[in-house]
Amino acid sequence: MNKKKIISILKEKLNLKDIYVTEDNNHYEITAIGNVFKGLTQVKRQKKIYNPLIDLITENKIHAISIKSYSLEEWDKNQK
């Protein structure tokens, strides 16, 4: 599994402004930015990311994921 495939899947399934993925073997860190996360709890945000990737997780192509998710407003505040 490569990070380009993960980016492609998430961009196709979620309305994201930006997405960044880093990879270390089968461990991935995902930072996703989009208003799809606005008003959602952290658990619901993680589910939004996990759901499109569930087949890759169950097939052990992805072993572990660390997720950071931001609405556009949160991302803008975080960058200052």
From Swiss-Prot:
Secretion signal span: none
Disulphide bond pairs: none
SUPFAM superfamilies hit by this protein: BolA-like
InterPro entries, A to Z: BolA, BolA-like_sf, BolA/IbaG_stress_morph_reg
Entry superkingdom: Bacteria
Similarity comment text for this entry: Belongs to the BolA/IbaG family.
Protein's recorded name: Uncharacterized protein BUsg_372
Organism: Buchnera aphidicola subsp. Schizaphis graminum (strain Sg)
